[in-house]
């Protein structure tokens, strides 16, 4: 952004207001570059990073970091969904985030920044070795918001897409596709602006897929060694939610619903209807 040499006081104030977010956004990008921001499998609420393993026998489960819908089956090679980028604000969990009183979360960072992430993925629950995923982070601090598109092949870290701009209200389509258990692609399309970015994984990944899970998730992701303070995102609805298994397309109607529980409080409410998955902050 360029400014003229003569600035009014209001322009100076606007620039000053934007500065903290700019620094935080830069810090997040540097953290990604240093390998510090990543998603995780779903954790059991109140545990020290114990993975919640779904068995498909219950309609709803609670996790400390995942909300949304998870299909359990075999041969999932593609997952896609569309959502509108939400307005985001400070969450009710406070700047200390989740679980400052025990175990892994004792060292939760003190911060005024709140974030959440909407993504689609293959594996990560009943299959713990890998997650192929892509989505959008949305963050809030001091009245300012930012949105970043990313891709990840867990257990490696997440990496930003650099050639796409995302704003509140944009319609986004996210797709992951596995061409083998160690290769595939992640694509984010901004249907509002016409921009599209893809990252291709050509083997040499840190973990192989099992292709047993397909998911549409809003996550309280990890930065450094702790979960970020969870943002109030209103609601995110994945529409045209589809997964491909054995050449056939399936929707989320038979998925297990997951909601986020932290410190004894349920922070989300998830519902599935037809080909849509809605996650609401409560």
From Swiss-Prot:
EC numbers: 3.4.23.19
Composition bias type Basic residues, residue spans? 27-39
Query: CDD domains in the record, alphabetically?
Result: Peptidase_G1
Q: Which residues carry this modification: Pyrrolidone carboxylic acid?
A: 110
In this record, what's one Pfam family?
A: Peptidase_A4
Q: Which GO terms describe its biological process?
A: proteolysis
Q: Name one GO molecular function term.
A: glutamic-type endopeptidase activity
**Signal sequence residues:** 1-18
Catalytically driven reaction(s)? Preferential cleavage in B chain of insulin: 3-Asn-|-Gln-4, 13-Gly-|-Ala-14, and 26-Tyr-|-Thr-27
Ranges for region Disordered:
27-46
Source domain of life? Eukaryota
Note the Gene3D superfamilies from the entry.
Peptidase G1
Q: Which family does it belong to?
A: Belongs to the peptidase G1 family.
Protein's UniProt name: Aspergillopepsin-2
Organism equals Aspergillus niger
